[in-house]
Amino acid sequence: MAPELSSNWKKLQEKLKAPQPTKSAPISQEAAFKQAISKKSISSETLKRKAEESQQQQQASNPSKKPKRQKSQTQSQPSSQKPTEEKMGGNVQSKPTTSSSPNSTLPSLHLWADEQGISSESLAEAYNLGLRGTSSSSSSSHIPLLSTLPPAIPNAGLTLPGHSSSSPKSNKNGLPLPTDLPSSLTLSNGLTLDTSTTTDLALILQATKSNTLGKYLSIDCEMVGTGPSGATSVLARCSIVDFHGHQIYDSYVRPTAFVTDWRTHVSGISKRHMASARSFESVQATVAALLKGRILVGHDVKHDLEVLGFEHPHRDIRDTAKYSGFRKYGHGPKPSLRVLAKEVLGIEIHQGQHSSVEDARVAMLLFRKEKHGFDMENSNRYEEGQAKKGGNGGGGGGGKKKKGKK
C-alpha cells in the first residue's frame, strides 16, 4: 500500500495537472486605453491627459497634418492675408501686415537734381560718375567714355538739347522761343551782340536761363595758314562740347584772309569745306555767347581765344597745358594733348588728321579726371591775389579792423 501524500503535495500536483494559460500578444497603447475605459480603471482626468499626449505624438510624427484647434499657440499669417486679431484683456487689437517690395522704384536722381536746381556736373562730381580709377597710368576704363559718345557731326552748328536747325522759330519740341529775351548781349570782353540777327543767340540765352548748357564747356579750334609762308594762323573750324562730352557746337569758318596753307594733313580742312562754312562774325558771336559766364576748358586755350578774337576771364579758364599735375609728362615747358591722352587716359589720338571735337572731348576728360586738383590750384592762385589786394583795405571788414588796431 503506497504511502499517503501530504496535503501540500496534493495541491502541487493539482497545479501541475491544470492547463497552463497561453501568453497573450502585447496590445497597443490605444487598445489598452479602450480596455481601461471599458473596465473604468482610470479616471477621466488621466484619460484626457493621455489623449492629449497621444495627439501630440501623432502631430509630431505627421507634421503635415495641422491640429483642428490650438488655443495656446498663435499662428503667423503671410503678408498677403488680412490683418490678424489677438484678444488681450478683453480688447481686440488688430495687427496690420506690412508688405515691402525689394524692387521698389526710386525717383530718378536726375529729376530730383533738376527740381533742386543742381547742375549735372555737380551731380556727376558728387557721385563720382563717369571717370573711374585714381591712378594716372593708362586704363581701359576711360575708353568707353569716348567710344560710347555719338560720333561728331561736322559743321552741324548749334546742337543744343531741344534745338532743331530746320525750325529756327521753335525748338525741337515745337515750343516757341521766349519773347522776353534782350535785344542785345554784352560780353565781358566788350563785344555787343545783336540777338535779333541770329536765332542761335536767342537759343543760347534760353538754354542759359534753363541751365541746359551746364557750367563747363570745352573748346578746340583748327587753324589754317595765311601770309607768305602760311605762318599766320586764322580760324577755320571751332568745336565745343559740354561736361559730358556731348557736342554743343561745331562749324567750319570762312577765313578772314587768303589761305596759303590749308594744313590739311593736320587740320583735316581743305578748300572744299568752305562751301558750307559760316562767316567768322557769326561763329565769333555764337561762341562768345556760349562761353559767357561759364568755365572754359581746353588745351593751350590762349591760341584758341586769339583766333576767335576775344578774351575770357582768366579765373574761369582750366587749361590742361598749364596744370601743374601734368607737367611731369612734358619734355618741355608743357606736354602735348596727344601725350596726356596716352599717359593719363590711356587712349591714342592724332593718328592722322586732327578732329577738333575729339580734342575738345579729350581735354574735358583730362579736366574731369583731375578736377579737384584743377579747382584747388585755381582757388589758391586767385585767392592769394585777392589777399594781396586786400592789404590796402580791399579785403572787407577784416582789413579795416586791422587798420584800427594799429
From Swiss-Prot:
Entry annotated with the keyword Ribonucleoprotein: no
Domain Exonuclease: 216-367
Enzyme Commission code: 3.1.-.-
Biased composition (Low complexity): 54-64, 72-82, 94-108
UniProt enzyme class: hydrolase
GO molecular function terms noted in the UniProt entry: 3'-5' exonuclease activity; exonuclease activity; nucleic acid binding
Composition bias, Polar residues: 1-10, 162-173
Chain spans, region Disordered: 1-108, 156-181, 377-406
Similarity comment: Belongs to the REXO4 family.
Stated role: Exoribonuclease involved in ribosome biosynthesis. Involved in the processing of ITS1, the internal transcribed spacer localized between the 18S and 5.8S rRNAs.
Protein name: RNA exonuclease 4
Originating organism: Neurospora crassa (strain ATCC 24698 / 74-OR23-1A / CBS 708.71 / DSM 1257 / FGSC 987)
Origin organism lineage: Eukaryota, Fungi, Dikarya, Ascomycota, Pezizomycotina
Chain's gene name: rex-4
